[in-house]
């Protein structure tokens, strides 16, 4: 048994799919099945859909070719017959079931046949039923819904018909023919978003306006052609209401597209952004390496007009500043320099601010450029500007800085006061000149301090804690607090005065200002507290009123209940009285009946007694009469 397992196993001649392996080996060319012999990769069609593609060497039989040709000929004949039928149908004189006229033509005939040339909707229906044979048997409500709906649609969609309000109340409107309608086939009304004649007129007017601007010699415009879907090209969008339009408008960038540039809208607008972004400039008009090559003289003049009109609307005008300085006892200070257009400031581009280190003779040094990035109140000791100036301070130099807010004013003397112990090299004449200069500068410090205060009060962006009030000479300074508060409260009733108490010195004017501001804030808090109390009192009054109303309602309900109880008691009392009366009547009747019965019994008794007496008497025998025998 084990030897039989050691023998070679017989090879299968068939696979699972029933294909003989010897036949497959004969097709391949050998008894074995090498994996790379006889099987070549075949190309496969990209679309393997039904019906399957025919092989390349397929030959059609003759009968199949004849049948295919016959079927193709029949199909061509049927298509030709259908085309002939369609042509005959198009040439027919009857386009609709009632004739060649459309609904709009029938309505036109109906309105034209009227004496007043106007008909109501019901009259149009009646004319259709009476004059068109097709609608004579379709006048009832069941069969007239379709064609009446078509008439209403044609009346509302065609331009040749217009609706006129009827004079009488509760009557339908009149339908008339529009005399301004175009002859021929009437055009249906479109939606408001589609391009109609009204939008075409607007587009024409806009193009004429652009041509007029071109002929007027407007400079700085792009050469782009107008877009067919927009009223104005991207490079020709101007703003006539702008004050800058008088001398030539801003140039728009060619990379900006329209906000709505589809074909369905012809009123596209452009974003009002300038073509070239301006670099940020200094706060007081110092340009930072910017050169405008497209700015013209007319444009600069327009900018000056704009800044002049804007300067008139500033909160602190020159007159108010003069009043403030007159009330405070300080000398008047000219306002900051006006804004100059960039073209006129090109000469000042390369002019940085300077720290004045005295002149060359007598030990003074030459002018040295100083950094432009200084804070608005750079005179305080906490400012980085003076720290930078201290590092470069030498015994032969006296550092004085110029305020960026007042470039034309004299240099300030804060550093001179701070560093008064600097030893100066030179003769006594230079010392005298220096003392005189210090006196002049000390007089001008007050004026500059007033301007600085005004700038800080009106500029919320600059924090007020940059002040170092201890370093300012406040010997002769005065402040009219009432006028200042009126000035602040005049701006839409907003009062915002924030002065930290830690930085305020013990000087009387500043302390009085702080006291007044704190008093005002306390009064405002008292006012808010009073308003809160008033609101709470109003709420309590409302609650009390609601309670009183509830009590009144309860009292009314109690009164109604009491009245109802009283009515019930009265009814019950009346009922009892009625019962008593009925009982008395019954008693009287009983008494009368009893008395009559007693009388009857008494009479009967007397009669009986009388009878007894009669029967109790002895009988008397009488003799018969004489004639009785």
Curated annotation (Swiss-Prot):
SMART domains: FH (SM00339)
The keyword Membrane belongs to this UniProt entry's keyword annotation: no
Gene3D superfamilies listed in its UniProt record: Winged helix-like DNA-binding domain superfamily/Winged helix DNA-binding domain (1.10.10.10)
Ranges of compositional bias, category Polar residues: 224-233, 259-268, 394-403
Bias type Pro residues, positions: 332-341
Residue ranges of the TM segments: none
Keyword Amino-acid biosynthesis: no
Intracellular or extracellular location(s): Cytoplasm; Nucleus
Biased composition (Low complexity): 342-356
Positions carrying Phosphoserine: 78, 193, 262, 265-266, 271
Protein origin, superkingdom: Eukaryota
Function: Transcription factor involved in the regulation of the insulin signaling pathway. Consistently activates both the downstream target Thor\d4EBP and the feedback control target InR. Involved in negative regulation of the cell cycle, modulating cell growth and proliferation. In response to cellular stresses, such as nutrient deprivation or increased levels of reactive oxygen species, foxo is activated and inhibits growth through the action of target genes such as Thor.
Listed name of the protein: Forkhead box protein O
Organism the protein comes from: Drosophila persimilis (Fruit fly)
């Amino acid at each position: 048994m084990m030897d039989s397992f050691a023998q070679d196993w017989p090879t299968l001649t068939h696979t699972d799919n029933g294909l003989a392996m010897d036949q497959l080996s004969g097709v391949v060319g050998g008894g074995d099945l090498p994996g790379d012999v006889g099987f070549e990769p075949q190309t496969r069609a990209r679309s393997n859909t039904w019906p399957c593609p025919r092989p390349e060497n397929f030959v059609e039989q003759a009968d199949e070719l004849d049948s295919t040709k016959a079927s193709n000929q029949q199909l061509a004949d049927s298509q030709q017959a259908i085309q002939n039928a369609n042509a005959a149908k198009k040439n027919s004189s009857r386009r609709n079931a009632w004739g060649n006229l459309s609904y709009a033509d029938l309505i036109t005939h109906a309105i034209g046949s009227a004496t007043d040339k106007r008909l109501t909707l019901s009259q149009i229906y009646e004319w259709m039923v009476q004059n068109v044979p097709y609608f004579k048997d379709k006048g009832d409500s069941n069969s007239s819904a379709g064609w009446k709906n078509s008439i209403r649609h044609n009346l509302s969609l065609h331009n040749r018909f217009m609706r006129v309000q009827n004079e009488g109340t509760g009557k339908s409107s009149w339908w008339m023919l529009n005399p301004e309608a175009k002859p021929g086939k009437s055009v249906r009304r479109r939606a408001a978003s589609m391009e109609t004649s009204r939008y075409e007129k607007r587009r024409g007017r806009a193009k004429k306006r652009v041509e007029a601007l071109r002929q007027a010699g407007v400079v700085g415009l792009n050469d782009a052609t107008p877009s067919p879907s927009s009223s104005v090209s991207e490079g020709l969008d101007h703003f006539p209401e702008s004050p800058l339009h008088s001398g030539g408008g801003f140039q728009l960038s060619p990379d900006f597209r329209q906000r709505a540039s589809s074909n369905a809208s012809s009123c596209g607008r452009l974003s009002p952004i300038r073509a070239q972004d301006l670099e940020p400039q200094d706060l007081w008009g110092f340009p930072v390496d910017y050169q405008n090559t497209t700015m013209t003289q007319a444009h600069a003049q327009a900018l000056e007009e704009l800044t002049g009109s804007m300067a008139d609307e500033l909160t602190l005008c020159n007159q108010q500043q003069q009043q403030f300085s007159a009330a405070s006892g300080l000398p008047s200070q000219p306002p900051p320099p006006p804004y100059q257009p960039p073209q006129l400031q090109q000469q000042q581009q390369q002019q940085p601010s300077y720290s004045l280190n005295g002149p060359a003779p007598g030990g003074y040094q030459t002018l040295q450029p100083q950094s432009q990035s200084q804070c608005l109140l750079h005179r305080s000791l906490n400012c980085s500007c003076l720290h930078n100036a201290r590092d470069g301070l030498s015994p032969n130099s006296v550092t004085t800085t110029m305020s960026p807010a007042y470039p034309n004013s004299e240099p300030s003397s804060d550093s001179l006061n701070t560093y008064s112990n600097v030893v100066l090299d030179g003769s006594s004449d230079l010392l005298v000149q220096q003392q005189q200069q210090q006196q002049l500068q000390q007089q001008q410090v007050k004026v500059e301090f007033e301007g600085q205060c005004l700038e800080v009060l009106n500029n919320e962006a600059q924090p007020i804690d940059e002040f170092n009030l201890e370093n300012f000479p406040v010997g002769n300074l005065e402040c009219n607090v009432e006028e200042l508060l009126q000035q602040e409260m005049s701006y839409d009733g907003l009062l915002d005065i924030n002065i930290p108490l830690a930085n305020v010195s013990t000087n009387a004017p500043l302390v009085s200002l702080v006291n007044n501001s704190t008093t005002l804030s306390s009064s405002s808090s008292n006012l808010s507290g009073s308003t809160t109390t008033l609101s709470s009192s109003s709420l309590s009054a409302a609650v009390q009123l609601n309670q009183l109303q509830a009590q009144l309602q309860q009292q009314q309900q109690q009164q109604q209940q009491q009245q109802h109880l009283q009515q019930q008691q009265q009814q019950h009392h009346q009922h009892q009285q009625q019962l008593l009366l009925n009982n008395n009547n019954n008693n009287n009747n009983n008494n009368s009946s009893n008395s009559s019965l007693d009388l009857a019994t008494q009479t009967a008794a007397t009669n009986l007694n009388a009878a007894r007496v009669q029967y109790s008497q002895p009988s008397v025998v009488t003799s018969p009469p004489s004639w009785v025998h």
